[in-house]
Amino acid sequence: MSLRRIMVTAVRNLHPVTLLPSPRINILYGANGSGKTSVLEAVHLLGLARSFRSSRLNPVIQYEQPACTVFGEVELTEGGTCKLGVSRERQGEFTIRIDGQNARSAAQLAELLPLQLINPDSFRLLEGAPKIRRQFLDWGVFHVEPRFLPAWQRLQKALRQRNSWLRHGTLDPASQAAWDRELCLASAEIDEYRRNYIKALKPVFERTLSELVELDGLTLSYYRGWDKDRELQEVLASSLLRDQQMGHTQAGPQRADLRLRLAGNNAADILSRGQQKLVVCALRIAQGHLVSQARRGHCIYLVDDLPSELDDQHRRALCRLLEELRCQVFITCVDHELLREGWQTETPVALFHVEQGRITQTHDHRE
């Protein structure tokens, strides 16, 4: 799938604009602060109903404007189109519409418009808390395993019930046992989906990474959130007193993590910033391949400031891999000359100059 039309109104400093992007490579260039990243943010808002730059959406709404709106027309892989719209009012009301109908949840957007973001904060995938890596993992599982979302919702409900009981002691023994059983069943299902996903992801990640950078010995492993040699029911029983003291459940899928190690160390501790960026890119590109295999569709990639941290050789290698995905890519940079060479002649490339919030489409540099 790809976006064939994007309409943006009152998003940060951007002037109202309608973009007709290329189905493949789109390069947005201009000075720092011109609004390039805000274009990526608008697409992200359309696909996930949230910003990647702010946990609150009020800062995204242009000054003195009552609301921001992003509309998109999606070219579906199986043919036909789908119209998506997201609007956020300053007073807090949020509207999501799909083909003219109100949507029930942002998950419907995510399913129709799978997005991959690579930006300066992407280092957090290696350096940050386990929660960030769980989000990465579960994004991938969600897009290849349709049974994952219902299982995840059951897990969250069971965890809320158990944690409430741990804090307040309001459940009778029979109810406690019932919720523990539900927690263990949902946990086993989630763990199975995650393990299967990592088994499929690892060889694709390793192959992709080898095309970007030589990092012999880098390993990717999955920790499920409790002892691999014990059943969760047993672990919960043995840690009950500690869970009550802490007020929440210590073991389970909510504690899962992905571990990237090199020479016995956490990869983030010994890799350079450029190497870390390439590892993150390899993970994101590998996810894109799995989405394509499972859905017979494609992710849309948002790559903010692609040239940063990379020399010419690695920049070209990354562009080549993004191009080989045959998906739609939006790339920002200050100087588009850094990205002018290396694309295949048959690959459609669109250039957009961004200056003080105004966006103008310029000619493909190869014409």
UniProtKB/Swiss-Prot annotation:
Subcellular location: Cytoplasm
Major location category of this protein: cytoplasm
Keyword annotations of the record: ATP-binding, Cytoplasm, DNA damage, DNA repair, DNA replication, DNA-binding, Nucleotide-binding, SOS response
A molecular function GO annotation: single-stranded DNA binding
Keyword Nucleotide-binding: yes
One Gene Ontology term, aspect cellular component: cytoplasm
Gene Ontology terms describing biological process: DNA replication; DNA synthesis involved in DNA repair; double-strand break repair; SOS response
UniProt xrefs under SUPFAM superfamilies: P-loop containing nucleoside triphosphate hydrolases (SSF52540)
A family per Pfam: SMC_N
Residues binding ATP, per UniProt: G30, A31, N32, G33, S34, G35, K36, T37
Keyword Transcription regulation among record annotations: no
Family: Belongs to the RecF family.
HAMAP family: RecF
Summary of the function given for this chain in its UniProt record: The RecF protein is involved in DNA metabolism; it is required for DNA replication and normal SOS inducibility. RecF binds preferentially to single-stranded, linear DNA. It also seems to bind ATP.
Protein name as catalogued: DNA replication and repair protein RecF
Species per Swiss-Prot/TrEMBL record: Pseudomonas putida (strain GB-1)
